[in-house]
Design a protein with these regions (language model features):
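Single conserved hydrophobic/aromatic residue that forms the stacking wall/gate
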Residues: 1-5, 9
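Metallocofactor- and cofactor-centric catalytic cores in central/energy metabolism, strongly enriched
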Residues: 10-13, 21-137
Length: 137
């Protein structure tokens, strides 16, 4: 629900955080930008949960992708997720993200077995779009 990661893909560093943690926590407005998808749509950069968190949801104010802008300030976790899905997720992945959001309950809905299913599916199938939550629930 809006944590950000800038970590490793397979064995190659994609990006490093450097001093970005200090910058985002001390900046007036923290903005993170990335394309909504990579590898010609095989990978969504907007996922239910990241495997490694560099920036928690408390440090992320705005997310920008090629699909749009999600202003996350003054929103609860579900509202943050909704804003990201509606405004930043690629249409190829929006329904999968909505489906994941419905799996959990409470203030911060999390379906633990399905939380990293996008990543697991990519490792197994080579395409995050093939994610089937029935395998993880």
């Amino acid at each position: 629900y809006s944590s950000a990661a800038s970590d490793v893909y397979k064995r190659q560093m994609m990006n490093g955080i450097g001093g970005s943690g200090d910058f985002t926590r001390n900046g007036y407005l923290s903005i993170f930008s990335c394309p909504s998808i990579t590898k010609e749509g095989l990978i969504s950069n907007i996922v239910p949960h990241v495997a490694h968190v560099d920036h928690t949801e408390h440090s992320v104010d705005v997310i920008i992708t090629d699909q749009g802008i999600a202003d996350l300030r003054h929103k609860d976790p579900v509202q943050r997720a909704e804003a990201i899905i509606e405004n930043c997720a690629n249409p190829m992945y929006q329904q999968l993200l909505w489906d994941y959001l419905k799996l959990g309950a409470g203030q911060t809905p999390v379906a633990l077995k399905a939380a990293l299913s996008f990543h697991a599916t990519f490792q197994e199938e080579g395409d995050m779009r093939k994610t089937d939550f029935a395998k993880y629930c």
